[in-house]
């Protein structure tokens, strides 16, 4: 029983150390692995056509456009 507690504590300490030493991009990646995701859209790093922008980003050739309904922007295909 003591070994299991020690092993768990060691695992937690190592995980926290990695988070402290990691740069911002790695922290975001690790936090996404650690935290359970509530919605499938949160798993994406960019917005898809007709969906809200994710951190101001849209997938592919889509553009983040601020509209009346979406103050933070919605991803739309823009004609060249």
UniProtKB/Swiss-Prot annotation:
UniProt keyword Secreted, yes or no: yes
Comment text on domains: The presence of a 'disulfide through disulfide knot' structurally defines this protein as a knottin.
GO cellular component terms listed in the entry, alphabetical order: extracellular region
Role, per record: Inhibits Kv11.1/KCNH2/ERG1, Kv1.1/KCNA1, Kv1.2/KCNA2 voltage-gated potassium channels and Nav1.7/SCN9A voltage-gated sodium channels. In vivo, no toxicity is observed upon intracranial injection into mice and intrathorax injection into crickets.
Protein name: U10-hexatoxin-Mg1a
Keywords: Disulfide bond, Knottin, Pyrrolidone carboxylic acid, Secreted, Signal
Maturation and modification: Contains 3 disulfide bonds.
Subcellular location: Secreted
Highest taxon of the lineage: Eukaryota
Tissue note: Expressed by the venom gland.
Post-translational modification Pyrrolidone carboxylic acid, affected residues: 44
Signal peptide region: 1-22
Propeptide: 23-43
Annotated S-S bridges: 46-59, 53-64, 58-75
């Amino acid at each position: 029983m003591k070994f299991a507690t020690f092993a768990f504590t060691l695992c937690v300490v190592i995980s926290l150390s990695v988070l402290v030493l990691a740069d911002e991009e790695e922290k975001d990646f690790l936090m996404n692995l650690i935290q359970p995701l509530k919605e499938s859209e949160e798993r994406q790093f960019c917005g898809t056509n007709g969906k809200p922008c994710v951190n101001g980003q849209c997938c592919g050739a889509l553009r983040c456009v601020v509209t009346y309904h979406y103050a933070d922007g919605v991803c739309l295909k823009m004609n060249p």
